[in-house]
């Protein structure tokens, strides 16, 4: 079983990719119907035949840890993961085991990173509070338990052992991936763990704040319906969330909106085919995605899909208006939405238990970085509202309207103009892209004279009617 079906070359996701979305929905519907039938019977038979200690560990590794788990239980869970991955990676030759279920590999990587994240958050909280000396001492004596290096080492080792990057590269060249898979990569267990470890690295690097490296990890994975992650709903959602958030923190707002919009539309179209437990867990994240879209739209005004636009107005209508108006009143709204929708950032190193005041909350750190960008663009809506009224305007006159010094306004105009030039992803690596002007308002400074031009795009009514008619009569 390969991770991407077919041998078609890479193709970029278009803005109005309704055909792509419908294909994803149809593909997911078939998978759900299949998994609810013979797949469950096959999984039960497999588990019944392989009920030994290792097989039990395989099943246990994908089970969520109780939210109220004690520190001892968290340590034991880490030891179990270490034993399992040591057996898989360091045995003499590839282990002859089949994954218990189709979704097992994703569940294991997902739970492994989740426990790592929650443990780091818990450890940082104990260090800041400095109230529970007994637990603080245990954590102080075990700095390598759930350490960042250990987790990254597991993920990179699974990728290297499975030769998954070589397999994906071969598939892009329309070659046989099994020719480069090696003895480990030819096994389902290693191939699936290696593949989802790439998605796991995207997540971990984003949680650590290295957004460029997070996107770089997906160089060998194509963001389309043929990708393996698109067949596992939770993996699909996670991938686009972290890619979109990384783009947002890199100020590539147009690309961030595309990623968030894609997955929200997909979720809305597949909700009738979701199993209740899976859908409930994903819909809890929908509000976060909408909050991030609201932030991105404030920086980069653009048209949204009708489904997203309606949901955004219903959930964040008042906040969106404040964001779009800009000014000091928008700052608390930006802060509120960011803190409610951002990942649970963590530090790559253990906290200092002896100096609690020296420990900085990673979320507060990234919030401060983000708010600096917000403050830079805070007056953008107001300035643009004046510029739209003129074709030429004196710099000092505009500074008088805004009650700022001319040189401060000049600096702001130069920074704002630079922000309108962004990379827009089309194909190949996610860090690559074509430079485009993402604003319909452009201007140039000639001494103290501002030359202004505005490009007004007419709405494509024909496309709008066709799209809505197809939805109505489908």
UniProtKB/Swiss-Prot annotation:
**A single Pfam family, by name?**
Paf67
Compartment annotation: Cytoplasm
Sequence ranges assigned to domain PCI in this UniProt record = 255-449
Q: Which sequence ranges form a coiled-coil region, renumbered to this chain?
A: none
GO BP annotation list: formation of cytoplasmic translation initiation complex
Xref: InterPro entries: eIF3l, PCI_dom
Q: Which PROSITE patterns does the UniProt record give?
A: PCI
Keyword terms, alphabetized: Cytoplasm, Initiation factor, Protein biosynthesis
For this chain, one GO molecular function annotation is:
translation initiation factor activity
Please give the superkingdom of this protein's source: Eukaryota
Its GO CC terms are:
eukaryotic 43S preinitiation complex; eukaryotic 48S preinitiation complex; eukaryotic translation initiation factor 3 complex
Family per record: Belongs to the eIF-3 subunit L family.
Quaternary state and partners of this protein? Answer: Component of the eukaryotic translation initiation factor 3 (eIF-3) complex.
Explain the purpose of this protein: Component of the eukaryotic translation initiation factor 3 (eIF-3) complex, which is involved in protein synthesis of a specialized repertoire of mRNAs and, together with other initiation factors, stimulates binding of mRNA and methionyl-tRNAi to the 40S ribosome. The eIF-3 complex specifically targets and initiates translation of a subset of mRNAs involved in cell proliferation.
Query: Which protein is depicted?
Result: Eukaryotic translation initiation factor 3 subunit L
Organism of origin:
Chaetomium globosum (strain ATCC 6205 / CBS 148.51 / DSM 1962 / NBRC 6347 / NRRL 1970) (Soil fungus)
Q: Organism classification, top ranks?
A: Eukaryota, Fungi, Dikarya, Ascomycota, Pezizomycotina
